[in-house]
Amino acid sequence: MNPNQKIITIGSVSLTIATICFLMQIAILVTTVTLHFKQYECDSPANNQVMPCEPIIIERNITEIVYLTNTTIEKEICPKLVEYRNWSKPQCKITGFAPFSKDNSIRLSAGGDIWVTREPYVSCDPGKCYQFALGQGTTLDNKHSNDTIHDRTPHRTLLMNELGVPFHLGTRQVCIAWSSSSCHDGKAWLHVCVTGYDKNATASFIYDGRLVDSIGSWSQNILRTQESECVCINGTCTVVMTDGSASGRADTKILFIEEGKIVHTSPLSGSAQHVEECSCYPRYPGVRCICRDNWKGSNRPVVDINVKDYSIDSSYVCSGLVGDTPRNNDRSSSSYCRNPNNEKGTHGVKGWAFDDGNDVWMGRTISEDSRSGYETFKVIGGWSTPNSKLQINRQVIVDSDNRSGYSGIFSVEGKSCINRCFYVELIRGREQETRVWWTSNSIVVFCGTSGTYGTGSWPDGADINLMPI
């Protein structure tokens, strides 16, 4: 090869290499520009349209680092669209209930700063469960805990902690309340908080940490609400509220709330005579509540709420094994689905039940006359057959020698079905335990299971003689 040919060959190779390098630089530039603009766009899986990221609620700010030769590009991954909960999955098929959580608040109060509380409940957002309670504005080892048996004071606040975390001094006080309900619509928490004078109380509606709406007492006689979770379906949350006599005719209303704003109010209709402290659960496309009749019945009222047209119906649980306390013994108790049974109807306790086809799962105190012990069972035909009494799958949650209290339901959405869970309030202190001057509680929580399970008893467990007076 002569010198001229060598020069031409070297030049051709150099030109080829230069061209390749030029094309690579163009590719890097195009990639950089594309990724820069795509960080502001998300593909919508519904219709393949491009949607801006900014209006979407970002739960986690994730950054992916992409390396191309010597160029570093930061690409923001668009978060999953947060949607309202619709609770359209079927209810889980269960054989009974398994232990889930216990906070041991009273035992811990013997040596730590734990809030004095009552009226606890549990509710979950799409990713985590929380426990709530109405605090008394004091810790247990504090002279302000004297005489905390009283239900309604201006110092009571709604407390919120992750489930299983006792209400310590760092606990968040969500709102001022001596009666409350809370629920998560898929986007944010709604808290319904009642406080004020007995004859002129106020219910505040707090959504996503902001006060959005309020309503005053309509019967001037202790406006009150559920003391357990409300339910939201497709952005509409329902809460049952009562104002009026605790031992006679009262005025119950069902409020429909969207992002904290009251959009409709429906009066109670149907055959229920007295409704308080409802334990509600989603029953798509509506909401179903099992409540307390504090006037005429030891059988529990049922309130069915139509979220679409705001209509209400009510009746009573058909099971002849009734759920309230006090009540007749199981041989003489009765319920015929439509009306209160007029059996030891005065007084009562918050409780729960839920339908399972024609059957009903329910919980109640073991004692027929006091808030002692706690049991659950299934009544065959208990949802559809008047005075049905065939009981199966009975479990003892708290033995009859130990105190219980309020109980309520909450729902947890799984991958394929909606599970029902319940909590039991374990009251300690006054009135029964007069060595101390305070009244407070801990909780135990169980959830439905399709598996097998054993036996036990899960009382509060604190030795009252070791507790601060």
Curated annotation (Swiss-Prot):
Q: Which SUPFAM superfamilies match?
A: Sialidases
Residues binding substrate = R118, R152, E276, E277, R292, R371
Q: Which GO terms describe its cellular component?
A: host cell plasma membrane; membrane; virion membrane
Q: What is its EC number?
A: 3.2.1.18
Q: Name one GO biological process term.
A: carbohydrate metabolic process
**Residues on the Virion surface side?**
31-469
> Per its record, what are the GO molecular function terms?
exo-alpha-sialidase activity; metal ion binding
Q: Does the UniProt entry include the keyword Ubl conjugation?
A: no
Q: Which cofactor does it need?
A: Ca(2+)
Q: Which InterPro entries would you find in this protein's record?
A: Glyco_hydro_34, Sialidase_Influenza_A/B, Sialidase_sf
Q: What is this protein called?
A: Neuraminidase
Quick one: which gene encodes this?
NA
